[in-house]
Amino acid sequence: FGDHFGDLAPFCFAVTRGDAEAAFDAFVDKALPKFGDYQDAMLTGEPFLYHAVIALYLNCGLLDPLRVCRRVEIEWRAGRVPLNAAEGFIRQIIGWREYVRGIYWLKMPGYERSNFLGHTRRLPEFYWTGETSMACVRAAVNQTREHAYAHHIQRLMITGNFALLAGIDPHEVHEWY
């Protein structure tokens, strides 16, 4: 692993279904009630805030997307979480994650090679080092390197949006993510 981005230690993620379910349960109990208010927030020194941090478990099959959405719906129906928290979570899973997953299965493998805007610039070195005067980019890159995690706002609105506006080749962005 020596030449790869980031470090293997400390390692804090679940590797079994039971541990992934326990991590999701902890999110539901502790963070979901505030998720709706803070789902798009970034705060220095708080890499996870009120996020579920379950994409990796969904992606490798340790958690099922429909099952986690139904669990959140149950929490809302029972009055344990506000509507904005339940709606925000379910929308991100079904309305975004599953939509993008569907595009992947529909359009691959050619989709990976697409470059609609014809962007050709190389990915800047600061995506690997975090050495930039842009505080949000620096924080998102450093957090990704340190925790192997960045929430959707950091990926979409910080590192992704910078790459789009700067004309970075999407293949380089894909390889970085």
Where are these regions (language model features)?
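Catalytic cores of enzymes that engage adenine nucleotides and/or redox cofactors via long glycine-rich
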Residues: 1-148, 165, 172-177
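Generic helix N-cap/helix-start motif at coil->alpha-helix transitions
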Residues: 152-153
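Alpha-helical support elements that line or immediately flank enzyme active sites
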Residues: 159-163
